[in-house]
């Protein structure tokens, strides 16, 4: 709950270590993450682009943003599903795993292939090789702890919002902001070092031109267009682009010379944390817990998952209930109404599960 309040966004398995009954955060660089506007949509001169709904915005700013909870990522052309979250990652099945490497090293027959490496055990889980991820077994305890922490934050709300509070000490401090996944920069960096890319400045420029493609979706020049120039200059030096901003500011620093891009940030990380604290109430706690339970349940589902005995017995018991069609429809309608989420403007939406890019995971 505290990580969610402070806007942490990078709680993958390498950034947390399980120690006894505690989960320790060892990389705090993404605390107090700022909220960014959709610069591409804002550059639409016709203003015909439909923005996210209230529920979608709420979902994007939810506890799921922390990266702590199970969530799928789909990698490569095969859309292979992987989970690198601290509480969702799966321990390796065996001590050794096959990975890309070199065969016949230091010989005339040296060639790329698959080699055996010792498997890395996730530090964020209290179990080792061959064990199942135990998090689903403790979901109720986790949700209970989340609710308890949230209630404690509500009790301390006024103290945290005071000008002399610990939260306010972050004002004026600099922090890094990651505008693209660093793996994108690393992939481009490898392309820059390929023989074909080293033959001319034009070949190098064509590799870096790929960074501009996301900006070209805008009808007019977007406000954050200077970001591309900064990315290009830094990658020409074979550096991974690095950007910073003040935790309580709305300007992005483009380089080490003090060049800034005003208005890049919609809501500063510090202001966003204050807003989350002010809006924290029983209904908000319940909403976040629904997301926590939903993401854990979705992680365990598969398109071709067989029905368990428990599921089959439930299905049979429902079929034998002596209810009329009208009563059954009424029950379904009541469930839909109970699960509905209403915003202040009266719009009604529902949370659901979506099929992943691999066509198998949810």
Which residues does each PLM region occupy?
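Regulatory N- and C-terminal appendages and interdomain linkers associated
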Residues: 54, 68-362
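Catalytic activation segment of kinase domains across protein kinase-like and atypical kinase folds
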Residues: 7-106
């Amino acid at each position: 709950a505290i990580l969610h309040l402070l806007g942490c966004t990078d709680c993958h398995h390498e950034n947390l270590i399980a120690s006894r009954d505690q989960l320790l955060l060892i990389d705090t660089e993404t605390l107090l993450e700022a909220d960014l506007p959709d610069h591409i949509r804002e550059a639409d001169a016709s203003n015909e682009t439909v923005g996210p709904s209230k529920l979608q915005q709420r979902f994007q700013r939810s506890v799921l943003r922390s990266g702590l909870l199970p969530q799928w990522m789909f990698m490569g052309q095969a859309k292979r599903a992987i989970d690198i979250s601290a509480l969702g990652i799966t321990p390796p099945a065996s001590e050794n795993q096959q990975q890309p490497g070199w065969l016949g090293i230091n010989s005339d027959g040296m060639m790329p292939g698959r080699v055996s490496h010792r498997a890395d055990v996730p530090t964020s889980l209290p179990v080792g090789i061959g064990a199942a991820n135990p998090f689903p077994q403790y979901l109720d305890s986790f949700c209970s702890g989340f609710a308890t922490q949230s209630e404690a934050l509500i009790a301390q709300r006024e103290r945290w919002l005071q000008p002399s509070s610990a939260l306010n000490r972050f004002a004026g401090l600099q922090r890094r902001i990651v505008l693209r996944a660093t793996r994108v920069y690393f992939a481009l960096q490898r392309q820059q070092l390929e023989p074909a890319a080293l033959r001319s400045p034009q070949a190098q420029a064509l590799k870096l031109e790929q960074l501009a493609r996301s900006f070209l979706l805008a009808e007019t020049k977007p406000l954050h267009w200077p970001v591309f120039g900064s990315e290009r200059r830094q990658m020409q030096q074979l550096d991974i682009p690095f950007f910073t901003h003040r935790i309580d500011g709305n300007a992005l620093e483009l380089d080490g010379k003090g060049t800034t891009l005003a208005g890049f940030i919609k809501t500063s990380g510090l202001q966003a944390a204050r807003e989350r604290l002010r809006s924290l109430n029983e209904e908000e706690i319940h909403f976040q817990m629904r997301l926590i339970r939903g993401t854990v349940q979705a992680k365990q589902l598969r398109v071709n998952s067989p029905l368990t005995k428990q599921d089959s017995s439930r299905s049979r018991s429902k079929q034998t209930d002596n209810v009329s069609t009208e009563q059954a429809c009424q029950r379904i309608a009541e469930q839909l109404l109970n699960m509905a989420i209403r915003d202040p403007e009266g719009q009604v939406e529902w949370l659901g599960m979506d099929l992943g890019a691999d066509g198998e995971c949810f």
